[in-house]
Amino acid sequence: MLTITSYFGFLLAALTITSALFIGLTKIRLI
């Protein structure tokens, strides 16, 4: 249970970081 929870937490964190980086690059290109 704890392993699955930590795994999904890590996956969610990775997805959030990836989205943040993608949005940042998009804003830099728009400027």
Curated annotation (Swiss-Prot):
Subunit annotation: The 4 large subunits of the cytochrome b6-f complex are cytochrome b6, subunit IV (17 kDa polypeptide, PetD), cytochrome f and the Rieske protein, while the 4 small subunits are PetG, PetL, PetM and PetN. The complex functions as a dimer.
Pfam families: PetL
Cell compartments where the protein resides: Plastid, Chloroplast thylakoid membrane
Lineage of producing organism: Eukaryota, Viridiplantae, Streptophyta, Embryophyta, Tracheophyta
Membrane topology, from the record: Single-pass membrane protein
Protein's name according to its UniProt entry: Cytochrome b6-f complex subunit 6
Keyword Zinc-finger on entry: no
Chief site of localization: plastid
Keywords: Chloroplast, Electron transport, Membrane, Photosynthesis, Plastid, Thylakoid, Transmembrane, Transmembrane helix, Transport
Membrane-spanning segments: 4-24
Similarity field: Belongs to the PetL family.
SUPFAM superfamilies: PetL subunit of the cytochrome b6f complex
Reported function: Component of the cytochrome b6-f complex, which mediates electron transfer between photosystem II (PSII) and photosystem I (PSI), cyclic electron flow around PSI, and state transitions. PetL is important for photoautotrophic growth as well as for electron transfer efficiency and stability of the cytochrome b6-f complex.
Gene Ontology CC entries for this record: chloroplast thylakoid membrane; cytochrome b6f complex
Single GO BP term: photosynthesis
Any one GO molecular function term: electron transporter, transferring electrons within cytochrome b6/f complex of photosystem II activity
Superkingdom of source: Eukaryota
